[in-house]
Amino acid sequence: MRPLASTFALHVRPGVRVAALTSIAMLAFASNSLLCRLALQAGRIDAASFGSLRLVSGALMLAIVARAGARRPAPPADWPAAAMLFVYVACFSFAYLTVSAATGALILFGAVQLTMFAAGWRAGERFAAIGWAGFGAALGGLVYLVSPGLAAPTPRGAALMTAAGIAWGIYSVRGRRPVDPVAATAGNFLRAAPLALALSVALATRFHVTPAGVVLAVLSGALTSGLGYVLWYAALRHLTAMRAAAVQLSVPPIAACGAVLFLSEQPTWRLALASAAILGGVAAVLATRARQAGGSR
């Protein structure tokens, strides 16, 4: 049995395949945000337990998928990637206890963009003029989307969300290296899960779970995190760091639209205009061939 990403790769043209993998991954990221909001903001589970269940369930799901599709030796352990995955999950969960959703999105994705753009620039990646214009439109649309409900975050919450964004940016940059995305992601989850469990033990006095909270955490881990990250790793092999950074700006408007559909939040013209700016800007970035400093690629 072949892994989903490998089977998909055999029957679809490369450009279409990358676009499809990226789009599905962004939907998974947005769904993950919705699940996290449902679980944490409603007090259905404590942040440490949510993070632990998310990583453990993701590790179990990915172990099953990796074992079913194993065709090559396991890749070497990538402890830095596993550590970044743990830092992202832990900081993200705890930040949303004190930071509003709109403010958190701006801090998180701002940190991701700066981290991945810095990595891309250091590696010699550059955009053509239309690519920079598209990125500016997408970033401006994101600020426009979240600014109406922007609330001053607590220093602790802002620091945690910034750390989550930096960790996710580093994790994504490292994700461009693996040849086997399923095995690499499974290994990262497997090594990050004990770190999350250790944190839960250290914070045992805050332990609080409900059946609904457990279900939401498992869905977040096994589906929108575990399998979603496999698709993201598969797409990352064909994206520059700067393109990968830009495309993630599409997650906030997708999540906002999901909140309208599934959380009964009211649609607004601001949401429609911001979403158009973000998605149009991302499309411009993806349509522009990235180049290396001093020459094209």
What do the PLM-derived regions correspond to, one by one?
Residues 17-20, 48-64, 131-137, 156, ...:
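Hydrophobic alpha-helical transmembrane segments of multi-pass integral membrane proteins
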Residues 34-46, 97, 143-156, 200-218, ...:
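Membrane-interface helix termini and inter-helical loops of multi-pass transporters
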Residues 49-60, 85, 93-126, 164, ...:
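Specific alpha-helical transmembrane segments that line the substrate/conduction pathway
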Residues 28, 69-109, 116-117, 137-144, ...:
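Specific transmembrane alpha-helical segments of multi-pass solute transporters/efflux pumps
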Residues 62, 85, 127-147, 164, ...:
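Hydrophobic transmembrane alpha-helices of multi-pass small-molecule transport proteins
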Residues 39, 50, 54, 95, ...:
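Hydrophobic/aromatic residues within transmembrane alpha-helices
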